[in-house]
């Protein structure tokens, strides 16, 4: 199974952008969850506005789908400035970045998604821009080449990444604010689903919102995507109000169980239990057993399973926990 095809993939998919624009919170007061991040950013933004300064450069990291782009847009809205958006892989040449930087107005936000994928050449351009609001440009080639400095307006760089550890130390150290986004609680996701349903003019019971939330793997992007699919199901079934029963039927049709697992999650956990006696099993063996790339297991499947206590990552390999056996209705093997 390809990760991009999974309904519960936390990566962005076609069709997500339209609904995101309709339901994305614009201000911190609309932002549900991440209470510590919300409180801290409120203080930092208010302080910057009182001083009439640009906000410090901000690094946002965490698993996909938790709202890094949303938070970047909220920061720009709260500061009352424009936001220019790009991503690490798109910035191939120093000139690409220079063009964006020189078009910024004072205090504007430059948002770079997947900032861990910037090339070393682009990072070298960023260092003086972030630190001194200056841009070093080479004019000419060979012995006649010379460097000139351009002054930039004070701006805020917001970088987003799922792999903070992949950032180079010089780049990471230049961010004055670092925020980690955590998986959301079922309660917060229930509020997010209810809010999204309201933005889409859907009538939905509290039970339906909760049912979608608890199968969303702690991820708002997945919750909103499941809401769209439940809406489709309700439309075809001529359900005026999306009830808890309608939500359960729709999610069962999508093969998403009560823990938010789909076929691929269950395949991985079943392989650990049935083929490797609960583990420990090495990553390469596990990847071969389920026919998936090791990166897919390590970056996509494991984080949520480990966070929820269904899988343990040890020096000897992956181990299924007691919770996994209970989920499948099995007795844990004992030696």
UniProtKB/Swiss-Prot annotation:
Its main location: cytoplasm. Pfam families: AAA_lid_4, RuvB_C, RuvB_N. SMART domains: AAA. One of its GO terms (cellular component) is Holliday junction resolvase complex. GO terms for biological process: DNA recombination; DNA repair. Has 3 domains, the large (RuvB-L) and small ATPase (RuvB-S) domains and the C-terminal head (RuvB-H) domain. The head domain binds DNA, while the ATPase domains jointly bind ATP, ADP or are empty depending on the state of the subunit in the translocation cycle. During a single DNA translocation step the structure of each domain remains the same, but their relative positions change. Homohexamer. Forms an RuvA(8)-RuvB(12)-Holliday junction (HJ) complex. HJ DNA is sandwiched between 2 RuvA tetramers; dsDNA enters through RuvA and exits via RuvB. An RuvB hexamer assembles on each DNA strand where it exits the tetramer. Each RuvB hexamer is contacted by two RuvA subunits (via domain III) on 2 adjacent RuvB subunits; this complex drives branch migration. In the full resolvosome a probable DNA-RuvA(4)-RuvB(12)-RuvC(2) complex forms which resolves the HJ. This is Holliday junction branch migration complex subunit RuvB. It comes from Mannheimia succiniciproducens (strain KCTC 0769BP / MBEL55E). The gene is ruvB.
């Amino acid at each position: 199974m390809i990760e991009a095809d999974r309904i519960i993939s936390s990566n962005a998919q076609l069709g997500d952008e339209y609904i995101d624009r309709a339901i994305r919170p614009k201000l911190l007061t609309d932002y549900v969850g991440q209470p510590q991040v919300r409180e801290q950013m409120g203080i930092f933004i208010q302080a910057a506005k009182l001083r009439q300064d640009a906000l410090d450069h901000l690094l946002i990291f965490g698993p996909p789908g938790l709202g890094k782009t949303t938070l970047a847009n909220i920061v720009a809205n709260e500061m009352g400035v424009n936001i220019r958006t790009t991503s690490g892989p798109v910035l191939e040449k120093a000139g690409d970045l220079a063009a964006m930087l020189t078009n910024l107005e004072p205090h504007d936000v430059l948002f770079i998604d997947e900032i861990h994928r910037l090339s070393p050449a682009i990072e070298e351009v960023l260092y003086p821009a972030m630190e001194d609001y200056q841009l070093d440009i080479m004019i000419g080639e060979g012995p006649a080449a010379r460097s000139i400095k351009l002054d930039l307006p004070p701006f805020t760089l917001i970088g987003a990444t799922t792999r903070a550890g992949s950032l180079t130390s010089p780049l990471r150290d230049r961010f004055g604010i670092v925020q980690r986004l955590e998986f959301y609680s079922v309660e917060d996701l229930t509020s997010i689903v209810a809010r999204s349903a309201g933005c889409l003019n859907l009538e939905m019971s509290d039970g339906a919102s909760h049912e979608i939330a608890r199968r969303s793997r702690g991820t708002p992007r997945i919750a909103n995507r499941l809401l769209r699919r439940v809406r489709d199901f309700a439309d075809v079934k001529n359900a005026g109000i999306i009830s808890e029963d309608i939500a359960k039927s729709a999610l069962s049709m999508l093969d998403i169980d009560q823990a938010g697992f789909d076929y691929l999650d269950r395949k991985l956990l079943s392989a650990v239990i049935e083929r490797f006696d609960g583990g420990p099993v090495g990553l390469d063996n596990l990847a071969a057993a389920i026919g998936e790339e090791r990166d897919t297991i390590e970056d996509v499947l494991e984080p949520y399973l480990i966070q929820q206590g269904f899988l343990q990552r040890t020096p000897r390999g992956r181990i299924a926990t007691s919770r996994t056996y209970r989920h499948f209705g099995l007795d844990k093997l004992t030696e």
